[in-house]
Amino acid sequence: MSATSIQPLLDILFQGKALTREQTASLFSTLIQGEMNEAVMAGMLMALKIRGETIAEISGAADAMRAAAKPFPYPSSMRTEGIIDIVGTGGDGFNTINISTTAAFVAAAAGAKVAKHGNRSVSSKSGSSDLLAQFGIDLTMSPELASRCLESLNLCFLFAPHYHGGVKHAVPVRQALKTRTIFNVLGPLINPARPEFMLLGVYSPELVTPIARVLQALGTQRAMVVHGSGLDEVALHGSTQVAELKDGEIIEYQLTPADFGVPQAQMSELEGGEPAQNAQITQSILQGQGSDAHTHAVAINAGCALYLCGLSDSVKAGTALALNTIKSGKAFELLNQLAKVSSEAQE
């Protein structure tokens, strides 16, 4: 769309009114194609933020970004079990160990098909991609190789900038604004593998139910959207607020560590460090040599993923399966296999 054709949509926004899903998709398509002036983009993002983005607007922005993404070749014939993503928005302000990335290895080793969509760090010192780079896992692995890893190893990591080139047009504006915008919630919603199942952590309790409604609008089959006492994942240090999408309905409830069959820990026990230090922690956990707090934090998140995939009938049973998988050494073996495939592809 040209600058003149998006003007009526911007006028609606600047009057404090909401856009439809289709109208928002049109605006974001223009942005992704690099056809939106930066001043206009800043105005659009701030108008959305100040009024508060609606379910339809977040869904429309996600539609545009999904449509423009580099395709992920995973035919429906290979989707019999369904794919899950274990992902957080980031930006919760805490520097924890890489819980969701480590949980992805555990869930995959326990039988889930995990396509984890990730990026470099938002709030911690070490994001999902920073950690994987430490293990020699190539972030720019071709979509074809990533698809083969998902098929043969149950796990692949999809580096967001590799699939969503158009987002680069928003980077200078986002950096200049220095405040959260709709982009902070879009990352987890635009996985190019289009997972049927999602364990999605959000940085604010106010986002839990709205983001579950967005997943419902986007056609996700089953999901848990969680906020864990300040963290964008299931909490070991307190209660977790959950909106679960199942059979087209959303139910809201709270979980505590006792619901998973593990003891509560202190937040300080989950603090992470630089990527090299976090890589050491992840390796220890996957080898069955992590601290109780680290191991349990990973297991309760992997346990929710296993529950969502239908591999366990409760989050408690899922956590037990995750803990047994860690003890078996299968998750550590998977880390080594993925690193090996990645390094061979780079030779």
Curated annotation (Swiss-Prot):
Positions of disulphide bridges: none
Binding site for 5-phospho-alpha-D-ribose 1-diphosphate: 88, 91-92, 96, 98-101, 116-124, 128
A GO term from the CC aspect: cytosol
Keyword Magnesium: yes
Keywords: Amino-acid biosynthesis, Aromatic amino acid biosynthesis, Glycosyltransferase, Magnesium, Metal-binding, Transferase, Tryptophan biosynthesis
Binding, Mg(2+) 1: 100, 233
Enzyme Commission number: 2.4.2.18
KW Amino-acid biosynthesis (keyword) present: yes
Reactions this protein catalyses: N-(5-phospho-beta-D-ribosyl)anthranilate + diphosphate = 5-phospho-alpha-D-ribose 1-diphosphate + anthranilate
Details of cofactor binding: Binds 2 magnesium ions per monomer.
GO BP of this protein: L-tryptophan biosynthetic process
Protein name: Anthranilate phosphoribosyltransferase
